[in-house]
Design a protein with these regions (language model features):
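Compositionally biased, low-complexity segments
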Residues: 1, 22-25
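Zinc-dependent deaminase catalytic domain
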Residues: 26-204
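Intrinsic-disorder-associated, low-complexity terminal segments enriched in Asp/Asn/His/Tyr and depleted
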Residues: 7, 12, 20-22, 38
């Protein structure tokens, strides 16, 4: 009986210690911002940006290369968690940019520009890579023409940040094809994780 009583006390002590450790971890997670525990049981502060925000930031960075004077758009095509193509809106390679000679507006649209999604898909075509089963991250909701190109190319999911003249027919086509559509907002926390100041090597 004494042996059984000793084992029972030992088990109770271990159970108490484990629960106490869990409580300590919970308290620490609140105090120091710990958000996860790794495979070795070590508490970590998760400072890595999530994949959707990462890919969308890549698209936003590309948008800064745009030569359109009305709207800067960037896009990246992702397959199996890897970027396989990218593009931004601008004039045909080797021809004047809108930033140099102005927009060429016809029926409310600039016909000089090649859209970001189109440039990304054409980059895939030039490299001989299929877009089938990939997803795209684009800064703005695709126009109806780009939507048709994306669907025809086999894109399985369209991710975007901002609504921009969302075309009802484009939305209906996406739904008819069973393609996933998701708005991926970028938060101030996401943006704050990218500290470019530490990479500055020269002061202008």
């Amino acid at each position: 009986m004494m042996f059984c009583s000793f084992n029972m006390r030992k088990r109770n002590k271990i159970t108490y210690e484990l629960k106490n450790q869990d409580l300590k971890r919970s308290i620490l997670s609140v105090i120091i911002g710990v958000t996860k525990i790794n495979r070795w049981g070590i508490m970590m502060k998760d400072e890595r940006i999530g994949w959707p925000a990462y890919f969308m930031m890549q698209a936003a960075m590309l948008a800064s290369r745009s030569t359109c004077t009305r709207l800067h758009v960037g896009a990246v095509v992702v397959k199996d968690g890897r970027i396989i193509a990218s593009g931004y809106n601008g004039s045909v390679t080797g021809t004047p940019h809108c930033t140099e000679v102005g927009d060429l507006i016809v029926d409310g649209h600039c016909i000089r520009a090649v859209h970001a999604e189109q440039n990304a898909l054409m980059q895939l075509a030039k490299m001989g890579i299929a877009a089938e089963g990939a997803e795209i991250y684009v800064t703005d909701f695709p126009c109806v023409h780009c939507t048709k190109f994306l669907l025809q190319a086999g894109i399985k999911k369209i991710n975007y940040i901002r609504n921009y003249n969302n075309d009802e027919f484009a939305t209906s086509l996406i739904q008819a094809k069973g393609v996933a559509l998701q708005q991926v907002p970028l938060t101030a926390t996401d943006v704050a994780m990218i500290n470019f100041d530490k990479y500055v090597t020269e002061n202008n």
